[in-house]
Amino acid sequence: MDKIIGLGNALIDVLATLKDDTLLDELELPKGSMQLIDDAKLQQINTKFSQMKTHLATGGSAGNAILGLACLGAGTGFIGKVGNDHYGDFFRKNLQKNNIEDNLLTSEQLPSGVASTFISQDGERTFGTYLGAAASLKAEDLTLEMFKGYAYLFIEGYLVQDHEMILHAIELAKEAGDRKSTRLNSSHHVVS
């Protein structure tokens, strides 16, 4: 069976189920949206989450797709960047647990990216996403070795803004014999 490698934002999902949507209003997060947040907003959310029951999961669009494929028995790998912290360790251990080949890079300067996920009573999800180390993945981080042995490269649509990295990844994948695939994550990527 052909193997597939994903390239994307290595994020940890911190999930919390809400009793009502008051907290979303308080944090100025529109229900059902995905908002990029800064460190100050992340700290504000973490303060709220410290008083709630939360659950951790690995995330990011490409990470989720690769995990799903691994669970179906496909040979998979993942390229992303995490911080040198407990979230980065969690992400790496989850890849290993699910037999996903680990091509994670580690930032010593930035913490791991976190998608604070608020689940409303009606099941709607709202994300406050701090990219952290995930956003520091650059073209020069990628090596030919990362792409060898894979038939397909799955590129997360949220990365299309970094044209240099995407083009370099495609060049390396092509040199390694991979085919490519891109997932456009939101209508914003289609119309911009």
Each language-model region and where it sits:
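Ribokinase/PfkB-type carbohydrate-kinase core domain
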Residues: 1-31, 54, 89-110, 114, ...
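Glycine-rich anion/phosphate-binding loops
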Residues: 56-60, 85-90
